[in-house]
Swiss-Prot record:
One GO process term, biological-process aspect: prolyl-tRNA aminoacylation
Source organism (scientific name): Mycobacterium ulcerans (strain Agy99)
NCBIfam families tied to this protein: PRK09194.1 (NF006625), proS_fam_II (TIGR00409)
Biological role stated in the UniProt entry: Catalyzes the attachment of proline to tRNA(Pro) in a two-step reaction: proline is first activated by ATP to form Pro-AMP and then transferred to the acceptor end of tRNA(Pro). As ProRS can inadvertently accommodate and process non-cognate amino acids such as alanine and cysteine, to avoid such errors it has two additional distinct editing activities against alanine. One activity is designated as 'pretransfer' editing and involves the tRNA(Pro)-independent hydrolysis of activated Ala-AMP.
Residues annotated as transmembrane: none
Gene name as annotated: proS
Classification via InterPro entries: aa-tRNA-synt_IIb, aa-tRNA-synth_II, aa-tRNA-synth_II/BPL/LPL, Anticodon-bd, Anticodon-bd_dom_sf, Pro-tRNA-ligase_IIa, Pro-tRNA-synth_IIa_bac-type, Pro-tRNA-Synthase_IIa_type1
Name listed for the protein in its UniProt record: Proline--tRNA ligase
UniProt-listed Enzyme Commission number(s): 6.1.1.15
């Protein structure tokens, strides 16, 4: 295929868009791949659509290779299935809802678990029909509060979502493993630098869960890794390395002190270091108790207290993941006024336990550890309160912030922080959705068997931006050959009629060899053409310029930056095709 730039619907820009924040956003707009039409909404122009379709092709090839069958659901979905799973409520303001002219409720699909489950239930009824994997590549919609970074976080986006259906956990594990390997092949073919991290399932439900994160400084996801062992996890899924318990016998009794106006950790530590306690005190020696209200879906608000070492803050992403699907709100002054036993700035475990407030502790607060914490009276704290002797909790919770240098959960070394962009997520859903819809089939013994599911997503349109983030330089984009809009960008940089005719002939020969060619036949200066070639980012650039008269053309490697001369002759097209395929 030959596409002439004189006929291509394309306009490049020399300046960055004023509202573009990240390199991919700037370059994709400047190079004419996408255009904004509203907050979080983008049109795909010819070059951008070719990249998107090439990524879809790679995904389809690998999904088909593991036995996936492609289907397509509507994007406009009725309310009823999402009411059955309670996700009509759980999604809150994050989805687009609408009514038809008869007052019936719909949403623009953010995800399709319900539809996949109902479809399989309606079509199959025997164990002989399984295992089964279905997938779709479909536009999704989410009402992002703050769309940002171009197509990295948009309101309308393309996803591949697949679902495996099996009659037992062994089949689910096999499907999960097959998808995991397929995803690795997909991202390797796309030349994405990524890491696989342990993750949490969130509103999707399920048990085992892993994310594929593309390494990027502009990523919104924080993850950690241990260099020594290879352990990696999304920050929400990090399990705190729990210290060993300490002996309780022989520890001094807890003592209540008048500490004055010390409602913050900083003021409490300052008091402690002036009080003659016989040791230097840091924030890590204090225990702060954070109060909130939580509500399970369909339930009532109830109090929850979380105790964390005073040198740690609550990480709201980790907190939300730990409490999911419950929602939470930190107590405000009006709330504290309703519970006089909660003395703001001086809350301790005693009042919490006496008033039946659910109390969860950070895993570092193990039996035998001694703490300075609130004494439930204004201006008073207790020193030497020992966990397991003076107070207990209802359990532990992973809600405190994770830090660079924290010990890895596997004990192999320290954690290193990094940032990434989520490009894929795989879940072992189990029976959450098949339970909701009673998706049973007849087993080998003639008795009903409840199907078990896996869910596997890839952000297809997001991958365009991710690859642009990872593969660009100060001149422009640099697309991997697998998904580039064209294999060769052929630039006519010579006004001579013979050179122009030779370039057009060369394009035809390359086309005959199966090479897709973008032919710059515009009446523009060589400088303009070269700048556009660098900006557009085809992996190979062939220049028919002044050297044509001497029997040579230039072949430029956009990835490696090398340039070499090739001799004009009968084998020129073959030589170029061999070079770009090698």
């Amino acid at each position: 295929m030959i596409t002439r730039m004189s006929e291509l619907f394309l306009r490049t820009l020399r300046d960055d868009p004023a509202d573009a924040e990240v390199p991919s956003h700037k370059l994709l707009i400047r190079a004419g791949y996408i255009r904004p039409v509203g907050p979080g909404l983008y049109s795909w122009l010819p070059l951008g659509l070719r990249v998107l379709r090439n990524i879809e092709r790679v995904i389809r090839e690998e999904m088909n290779a593991i036995g996936g069958q492609e289907i397509l659901f509507p994007a406009l979905l009725p309310r009823a299935p999402y009411e059955t799973t309670n996700r009509w409520t759980e999604y809150g303001d994050g989805v687009f809802r609408l009514e038809d002219r008869r007052g019936n409720d719909y949403l623009l699909g953010p995800t399709h678990e319900e539809l996949f489950t109902l479809t399989v239930k309606g079509e199959y009824n025997s164990y002989k029909d399984f295992p089964l994997t279905l997938y779709q590549i479909q536009i999704k919609y989410r009402d992002e509060a703050r769309p940002r970074a171009g197509i990295l976080r948009a309101r309308e986006f393309v996803m591949k979502d697949s679902y495996s259906f099996d009659i037992d956990s062994g089949g689910l594990k096999a499907a999960y493993h097959a998808h995991r390997e397929a995803y690795q092949r997909i991202f390797d073919r796309l030349r994405v630098r990524y890491v696989i991290v342990s993750a949490v399932s969130g509103a999707m439900g399920g048990s085992a869960s892993e994310e594929f994160l593309a390494e990027s400084p502009v990523g919104e996801d924080t993850f950690v890794r241990c260099v020594e062992s290879g352990y990696a996890a999304n920050v929400e899924a990090v399990v705190t390395a729990r210290p060993e318990s300490l002996p309780i016998d022989g520890q001094p009794d807890a003592v209540v002190h008048d500490t004055g106006e010390t409602p913050t950790i900083a003021t409490l530590v300052a008091w402690a270091n002036e009080a003659g306690l016989g040791r230097e005190v840091s924030a890590a020696d204090t225990l702060k108790n954070v109060l909130m209200k939580i509500r399970q879906p369909g339930g009532e608000w109830e109090l929850l207290a979380i105790g964390v070492p005073g040198d740690r803050e609550i990480d709201e992403k980790r907190l939300a993941a730990a409490l999911d699907p419950a929602e939470y709100v930190f107590l405000d002054d009006d709330d504290f006024g309703k519970y006089p036993f909660l003395v703001k700035g001086y809350i301790g475990p005693k009042a919490l336990r006496s008033n039946d407030v659910r109390y969860l502790l950070d895993p570092r607060v193990v039996d035998g550890t001694s703490w300075i914490t609130g004494a439930d009276e204004p201006g008073r704290h207790v020193v030497g309160l020992v966990a397991g002797r003076d107070f207990t909790a209802d359990g532990t919770i992973e809600a405190a912030e994770v830090r660079e240098g924290d010990p890895a959960p596997d004990g192999a070394g320290q954690l290193v922080m990094a940032r990434g962009i989520e490009i894929g997520h795989i879940f072992q859903l189990g029976r959450k959705y098949t339970d909701a819809f009673t998706a049973d089939v007849l087993g080998e013994d003639g008795k009903p068997v409840r199907l078990t599911m896996g869910s596997y997503g890839i952000g297809v349109s997001r991958l365009v931006a991710v690859i642009a983030e990872q593969h660009h330089d100060n001149l422009g984009l640099r697309w991997p050959a697998e998904i580039a809009p064209f294999g060769v960008h052929l630039v006519i940089a010579n006004k001579d009629a013979e050179a122009r005719a030779g370039a057009i002939g060369l394009a035809g020969e390359l086309d005959g060899l199966g090479v897709e060619v973008l032919l710059d036949d515009r009446q523009a200066s060589p400088g303009v053409k070269f700048k556009d070639a660098e900006l557009l980012g085809m992996p190979w650039v062939v220049v028919v310029g002044r050297g044509w008269a001497d029997g040579v053309v230039e072949l430029r490697d956009r990835f490696g930056g090398q340039t070499r001369e090739l001799t004009v002759g009968d084998s020129l097209a073959t030589d170029i095709a061999a070079a770009i395929s090698g």
